[in-house]
């Protein structure tokens, strides 16, 4: 009975925004029609479960804010009606609400804002997966054991009464023969009840084993490196596991690239590369390793699927010294070196190259884990003026955040943690033009900038650090012809 109680409440824990590692929450900065919004989606602890949604509307006379979970397989037509959000006490422009995520797979939270400027909707992609288990607490286990004992005792009492006193007509004595018969029936019922309990425990263990087999984990990436006199070619094969196969759809380009690959040298995180290997098969990617020094690297590969899911594959790779001049396989590849002993903290300014500098406007309050924050940076030219940037992969800037133990990885944009192409695939699915010649018509912007995107050198990345620790942040911009990378470090409380 104790063993049964110990597993009786093992439950699934989902991760939302599994496109990244160690980041449970989704953060989006954008617009819902004419209204500028920030949306934060916090995952539920179980699936099915309720996700917490926080929406901040920064301008406009707002009358209603509705949130709606849209599952990829059913689309908007099969989604439930929107739920009204409620204002946060003491914050006129902040709203809170909860949504049920009922299944594993690709969701989007549709945020509809209505007011004096009309109505508009923002689409925030969310991935819902079972990725862990929670053990039963000792206190609750003890309570369940006591209640189970009471239930078993009650059932045996009912059996004894049914075979004994209940069969005695009114006024007749309950003699020894009837008592022996009642005891015999109770003795027969006891092992049958024990067998039922054993069968229930065995069934639950089978359910738990089946659940473990289907728990989602980051798909395995198998890297191999081929080295000759002039090339260091990295090939990454993504394993199509049973869990991955259950949610798989073809890979689609995000910002014009089939994969965004990041290399971080460990343990000092003193070398960094943002690469774009080509797709040689459905789940095989390859490209040249640039002029980064030899060492052990942690690789993170961002993929976006045609069903709107984004995911990150990861592994380690040992890179030897280059034997000759290395030519990048993609013109948008970029890399940088930053000695691990150099700590460029918030409030500091670092040289980018080509006469440009980048400053982190973060000398104020300390950064607190699990609290929404704005990472603000300013790019200036040689004259000290705020630089005008060129699009780099469709964005004014990209940022990568990695904890010093590599347990946290996130690829950020000024719009937040979401993949832009994931928003696009949900939007075009609503219009009914999801595919063209059997393939998704997505990422129409490719590497160009979004039409309404600011290209100012004043940059803001919305983010929530998931846990305390030391983090390294790489910020990439393109003020001239080449991509420049700044490196910063921060301690999060």
PLM regions and their residue ranges:
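Positively charged n-region of N-terminal signal peptides that target proteins for export
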Residues: 1-4
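Bacterial N-terminal signal peptides
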Residues: 6-14
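N-terminal soluble domains immediately following signal/targeting peptides that reside
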Residues: 19-166, 173-191, 196-493
């Amino acid at each position: 009975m104790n063993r049964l109680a110990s597993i009786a409440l093992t439950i699934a824990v989902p991760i939302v925004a599994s496109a990244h590692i160690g980041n449970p929450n989704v953060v989006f900065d954008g617009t819902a029609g004419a209204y500028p919004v920030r949306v934060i989606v916090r995952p539920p602890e179980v699936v099915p479960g309720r996700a917490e949604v926080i929406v901040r509307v920064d301008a406009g006379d707002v009358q209603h804010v509705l949130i709606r979970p849209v599952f990829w397989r059913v689309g908007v037509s099969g989604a439930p009606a929107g739920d009204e959000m409620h204002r946060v006490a003491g914050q006129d422009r902040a709203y809170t609400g909860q949504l049920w995520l009922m299944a594993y797979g690709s969701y989007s939270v549709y945020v509809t804002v209505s007011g004096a400027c009309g109505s508009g909707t923002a689409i925030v992609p969310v991935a819902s997966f079972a990725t862990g288990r929670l053990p039963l607490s000792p206190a609750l286990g003890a309570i369940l054991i006591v209640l189970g004992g009471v239930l078993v005792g009650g059932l045996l009492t009912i059996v004894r009464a049914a075979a004994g006193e209940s069969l005695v007509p009114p006024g007749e004595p309950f003699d020894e023969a009837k008592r022996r018969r009642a005891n015999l029936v109770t003795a027969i019922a006891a092992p049958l009840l024990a067998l039922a309990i054993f069968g229930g425990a065995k069934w639950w263990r089978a359910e738990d084993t089946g659940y473990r087999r289907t728990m989602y984990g980051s798909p395995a990436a198998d890297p191999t490196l081929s080295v000759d006199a002039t090339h260091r070619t990295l090939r990454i094969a993504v394993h199509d596991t049973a869990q991955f196969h259950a949610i798989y759809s073809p890979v689609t380009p995000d910002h014009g690239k089939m994969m965004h690959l990041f290399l971080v040298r460990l343990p000092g995180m003193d070398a960094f590369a943002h690469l774009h290997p080509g797709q040689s098969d459905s789940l095989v990617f390859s490209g040249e390793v640039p002029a980064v020094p030899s060492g052990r690297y942690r690789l993170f590969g961002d993929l976006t699927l045609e069903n709107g899911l984004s995911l990150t594959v990861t592994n380690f790779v040992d890179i030897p010294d280059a034997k000759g001049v290395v030519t990048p396989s993609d013109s948008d590849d970029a890399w940088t070196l930053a000695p691990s002993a150099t700590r460029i903290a918030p409030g500091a300014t670092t040289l980018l190259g080509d006469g440009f500098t980048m400053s982190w406007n973060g000398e104020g309050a300390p950064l607190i884990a699990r609290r929404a924050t704005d990472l603000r940076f300013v790019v200036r030219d040689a004259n000290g003026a705020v630089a005008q940037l060129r699009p780099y992969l469709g964005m004014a800037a990209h940022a990568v955040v990695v904890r010093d133990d590599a347990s946290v990885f996130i690829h950020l944009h000024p719009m937040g943690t979401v993949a832009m192409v994931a928003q696009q695939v949900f939007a075009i699915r609503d219009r009914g033009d999801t595919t063209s010649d059997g393939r998704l018509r997505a990422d129409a912007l490719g590497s160009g900038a979004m039409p309404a995107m600011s290209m100012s050198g004043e940059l803001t990345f919305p983010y929530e650090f998931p846990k305390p620790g030391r983090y390294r942040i790489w910020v990439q911009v393109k003020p001239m012809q080449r991509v420049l990378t700044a490196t910063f470090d921060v301690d999060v409380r």
